[in-house]
Curated annotation (Swiss-Prot):
Record carries keyword Thylakoid: no
GO-annotated biological processes: protein quality control for misfolded or incompletely synthesized proteins
PROSITE patterns cross-referenced by the UniProt entry: CLP_PROTEASE_HIS, CLP_PROTEASE_SER
Protein name: ATP-dependent Clp protease proteolytic subunit
Matching Pfam families: CLP_protease
Gene3D superfamilies: 2-enoyl-CoA Hydratase, Chain A, domain 1 (3.90.226.10)
Native source species: Sulfurimonas denitrificans (strain ATCC 33889 / DSM 1251)
Cell location: Cytoplasm
Keywords carried by this UniProt record: Cytoplasm, Hydrolase, Protease, Serine protease
Function: Cleaves peptides in various proteins in a process that requires ATP hydrolysis. Has a chymotrypsin-like activity. Plays a major role in the degradation of misfolded proteins.
Lineage: Bacteria, Pseudomonadati, Campylobacterota, Epsilonproteobacteria, Campylobacterales
Length: 196
């Protein structure tokens, strides 16, 4: 069981207690901490839709610390990021691996960041197949289709050729924050938060 801190906010009307994630949501901050799965994706999609309804013009800040996860769940988040009107700024804290890295690169151009000691890792989609030979063939065909789709999007996000992305994702490919900037995954390594 994970521990979720609570914060107490004092207002003219008295005190109010929030779990930390609800409090961050008030500031248009969404956290992805851990594996990308259907439950996590549903929560993140709902938060993005809520923030769009609150103010379609203000940016959303999407902090990512994830080892990756289920491709279809990640694509639900990706499609929502592109569907909603606000820009989604992405910030890697800790790690963005696999689908986490894909989502990091999918933030609004010019608004994709990583902290200095973050690790970013890209690779091809993982999958396993069992069952009858024809079912395994169907699953193999689908994972190859997904691989092509993900590589095409990643190539566009990073301004790289599809051939380069195919080569670079053939095996686990780890990058530092600075290397991921050179690759085009992010736009800037954040050293200190601005005092705006």
């Amino acid at each position: 069981m994970s521990y979720i801190p609570y914060v107490v906010e004092k207002t003219a009307r008295g005190e109010r207690s929030y779990d930390i994630y609800s409090r961050l949501l008030k500031d248009r901050i969404i956290m992805l901490s851990g594996e990308v799965n259907d439950a996590v994706a549903s929560s993140i999609v709902a938060q993005m839709l809520f923030l769009e309804a609150e103010d379609p013009e203000k940016d959303i800040y999407f902090y990512i610390n994830s080892p990756g996860g289920v491709v279809t769940a990640g694509m639900a988040i990706y499609d929502t990021m592109n569907y909603i009107r606000p820009d989604v700024a992405t910030i890697c804290v800790g790690q963005a691996a696999s689908m986490g890295a894909f989502l990091l690169s999918s933030g609004a151009k010019g608004k994709r960041y990583a902290l200095p000691h973050a690790r970013i890792m890209i690779h091809q989609p993982l999958g396993g197949a069992q069952g009858q030979a024809t079912d395994i063939a169907i699953q193999a065909k689908e994972i190859l289709r997904m691989k092509e789709e993900l590589n095409a999007i990643l190539a566009k996000n990073c301004s790289q050729s599809i051939k380069k992305v195919e080569k670079d994702t053939d095996r686990d490919n780890f990058m530092s924050a600075e290397e991921s900037k050179e690759y085009g995954m992010i736009d800037e390594v954040l050293l200190k938060k601005s005092k705006e």
